[in-house]
């Protein structure tokens, strides 16, 4: 049996899945196939008729945001809900117990403004999760609340990058200095220093 992409066989003759290294062997793959190869245990569970555990959990820490982007469907609202910290920590414990391996902090707001954001991120990393975040980046930087000690804990960062020209700030915030260039540069530099595989997406 082969996968549709480039006819690469992923099964051994006895019907078991081949190891990732045996399948890859210098080939280039689409991101979806690469992800599949990273989770051969899930494929084996499906093959054996067992329900596989989720790979990734997304946690919306808060609906509040520190920006008021004119183009955001959540802009101009008086919302400040946030998940209680203890609930988040218990959820992380539960996710780990059922075999989840990655967590991404996201939501209708900016996750980094949760009052216990740093505590939650450290707790999740201590549990062994791969970590990601969807963020506007406004709080990331050497002179901002989220610094290297937290940035280095993330395996990937999805940073809002709506434009690089200086004038676009007027669309984004009630305060100045939110242009994404400084934040993007900071996160990229710190990731280069602290991660074997820096990964920033816009």
Descriptions of predicted regions:
Residues 78, 109-110:
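Short, acidic/glycine-rich phosphate-metal binding loop used to engage nucleotide
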Residues 1-79:
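N-terminal pre-core extensions flanking Radical SAM catalytic domains
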Residues 82-106, 113-202:
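Radical SAM/AdoMet-radical enzyme domain recognition
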